[in-house]
Amino acid sequence: MKKTLIFALLLALLLSLVACAAAPTETTAPTTEPTIPSQSPEEEEVFKILMIGQSHAQDASWLVCDVLSAEMPDKKFLVADIYQPLHLDQHIKNIKENNAVYDYAEITNGSNLVKTPNYTINVAVKKHQWDLIVFNEATWPQTEEASYTDGDFQWLTDWLRENAAWPHFKFAYNATWAQPISKENYAIGRQTAPDGFRGTYNEKFGGDRTKHFARICELMEKYVETDPDYDYVFHSGTAIQYASETFGVPEGDPERRYELYRDYTHMSDFGRLIVAYQWYCQIFGIEELKEVKVNVIPSHMRTKCAMSYGDLTIDDTMKQAIIESVNYALKNPNIAPPQTARETPVLEPLG
């Protein structure tokens, strides 16, 4: 009897110990967010941007380093552009086949420009630990819904995350500008669109640049701005649309200083500078642009059709246009500006 009682007590004690061991242990230790690995010291001291795309992408990024280094002279910047006039599906094909068909350009503080031909996107994404990678589709495909629903955008995003040298980069989409068609549209440049392009444009938008712009904005809001993969959407097209509708090209502008477009679809130096300031404000969270510190675009940084004119001095008329256009886009990213063209005075070059 006594042995049975002792055995029962021991069994009860053993079961109690097992139950205690199985119970979850509560802890009051604070939980911590996973830390993002730092870049290497030599990479961390330079803010680095890679732009992937075609001619509209090149227009958008070309003067960004000049703007950043003028506005933030104590910091180091590198802006690279990998260019080939292709749509996204063709870029993806070249990535999969590792085709060396791209022109690669790096721009650093002081308008230092180094170009390298026969490059691959595969090499470019690993060349530096990029802080920001930007992509845009060409202006025309940006108006096609299929461009956003065929899976190519997601494929590129996933591939970049898996293959970039630093996978914690920020990702941005650059929303481009609507295309003018004829010299009658203000601030468009010296050339008109080819007949075939003009026919397609007129068929789809009735030759109305405002309708073209509205379509881009509609699809940006529907597909890109709601996509969590993008940290930024740069509203370059809105800033250009405002400048196009507000600041007219004056007569007697032989050096093409005040034009926004150099042809029927591409930016002039002035247009590129407006877009660069749009990027600057959005990247660094500047809610209102109050001053433009870029005073000169060196001749070697100008578009090919304008290099022969030498350096481009950015006068007060241009600076005011930049400030107004960028601030409009910051406050009204997807809203067409009113058509209130004013006469732009012709000022003598300052230098």
Give the role of each language-model region.
Residues 30-48:
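N-terminal low-complexity, Pro/Thr/Ser-rich intrinsically disordered segments
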Residues 21-23:
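Bacterial signal peptide processing site
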Residues 50-52, 174:
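Short hydrophobic segments within beta-strands
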